Regions:
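Conserved aromatic-histidine-acidic binding/catalytic patches
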Residues: 29-32, 36, 45, 118, ...
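Short, conserved catalytic/metal-binding motifs centered on acidic residues
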Residues: 44, 86-98, 130, 177-186, ...
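Electropositive, glycine- and tryptophan-enriched low-complexity nucleic-acid-binding patches
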Residues: 55-59, 112-176
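An internal, acidic/charged active-site-proximal segment
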Residues: 145-261
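Active-site-proximal, Lys/Arg-enriched surface segment
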Residues: 60-138, 257
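Generic alpha-helix structural propensity
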Residues: 24, 36-39, 52, 56, ...
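Hydrophobic, Leu/Ile/Phe/Ala-enriched alpha-helical segments that form helix-helix packing faces
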Residues: 32, 48, 79, 166-170, ...
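Gly/serine-rich nucleotide phosphate-binding loop at the start of the catalytic core
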Residues: 1-63
C-alpha cells in the first residue's frame, strides 16, 4: 500500500457523507483546513484549495446536507494512532455571539478571554467536542464528535450521551478507553451516568477543592451530642491534610508541550 492510499480512502469516504452540494462542501472543508483564521466564511473562497466562487460557498452552507451519523462512524473507525488503549478528551468550546441578539437559543457561558460588563461571561453558543489524544509528544488531535449544548442542557449529561454513542461506534480493540475531562465537569455525575459503560474516566480537580473522609476515620464516636457527619479533611492545596496514598503514579513533566499524565 502506498503511503497516501489510506488518506485517499478516507477522503473518498468523507465525500460520501456529503449528500447535497457535496463538491462545494468538500472544497470548503479543504479551504478550512489549509487557511489561516479568517474574519468571515466568504474569505475562504479566496483560498487556492477553493476553486469555486463565493456564491457556491454560501449555497453550500445554506442548502448543503451532511450525514452526521455516517461522518461520526467514519471518524470513529479512523483512530489517530495505534495504542494499547484509546484516550479521548472531552471539553466545551464557546462561540461568542454577543451582538447577535436575534440568534436562537443563546446562553451565557464562561469565556477566558472575552468579557461582558467586567465579567468573563459572554452570550453565545456552546459546543462540546470529543477528540482522540495520544501519548506521543505532538500537537495533533483527532476530533470524533461535536454536539451543541443548549441552554437547558447540562454538560455532564451531554458528555454521557456522547461517550456512550462513541463506545457503540468504535471498534472495541485494545484496552479500555480512557476519557479525560477538565475541572468544570462533575466526576460523580459522570461516574453514575457511565457506570455500566466499558470505559474509564479521569477528571481534573480544582486546587481549591476539599473532601472529607468517612466519619469512622476521625476516631471513636462521641458519647454525647450529634454523631459526626464528616471525617478527616482532605484539602487539595494543603499537603499536610493528605493521608498516606494507596497508590502512586509518576507524571512526566514536559514544559514544551504540556504535562502528560
Amino acid at each position: 500500500m502506498r503511503p497516501y492510499d489510506a488518506l485517499h480512502a478516507f477522503r473518498h469516504s468523507l465525500y460520501g457523507c456529503l449528500h447535497r452540494r457535496g463538491d462545494a462542501l468538500f472544497e470548503l472543508i479543504d479551504a478550512i483546513l489549509t487557511a489561516d483564521p479568517v474574519p468571515a466564511p466568504v474569505h475562504l473562497s479566496l483560498e487556492t484549495s477553493h476553486r469555486r466562487g463565493w456564491g457556491s460557498l454560501y449555497a453550500a452552507l445554506r442548502r448543503g446536507r451532511i450525514d452526521a451519523e455516517a461522518l461520526r462512524d467514519l471518524l470513529a473507525h479512523h483512530p489517530l494512532a495505534e495504542s494499547e488503549a484509546p484516550v479521548y478528551a472531552v471539553d466545551v468550546s464557546v462561540w461568542p455571539r454577543c451582538d447577535a441578539e436575534s440568534s436562537p437559543q443563546r446562553g451565557f457561558y464562561y469565556h477566558p478571554s472575552r468579557h461582558s460588563a467586567g465579567q468573563p461571561i459572554v452570550a453565545g453558543w456552546a459546543y462540546q467536542f470529543v477528540a482522540q489524544l495520544t501519548f506521543v509528544r505532538e500537537s495533533w488531535t483527532a476530533p470524533v464528535d461535536a454536539l451543541r449544548v443548549h441552554p437547558d442542557q447540562e454538560v455532564n449529561t451531554v458528555a454521557t450521551v456522547q461517550v456512550e454513542a462513541l463506545l457503540g461506534r468504535s471498534p472495541m480493540e485494545g484496552g479500555i478507553p480512557l476519557f479525560v475531562f477538565d475541572a468544570g465537569y462533575d466526576p460523580v455525575k459522570l461516574q453514575q451516568g457511565l457506570e455500566s459503560s466499558p470505559c474509564q474516566i479521569l477528571v481534573r480537580l480544582r486546587a481549591g477543592r476539599c473532601f472529607y473522609g468517612d466519619p469512622s476515620l476521625a476516631g471513636p464516636p462521641a458519647t454525647t451530642g450529634r454523631p459526626r457527619r464528616h471525617g478527616p479533611k482532605f484539602d487539595c492545596k494543603d499537603p499536610s491534610t493528605w493521608p498516606e496514598p494507596t497508590a502512586e503514579h509518576t507524571c512526566e513533566d514536559a514544559p514544551a508541550t504540556g504535562r502528560y499524565a
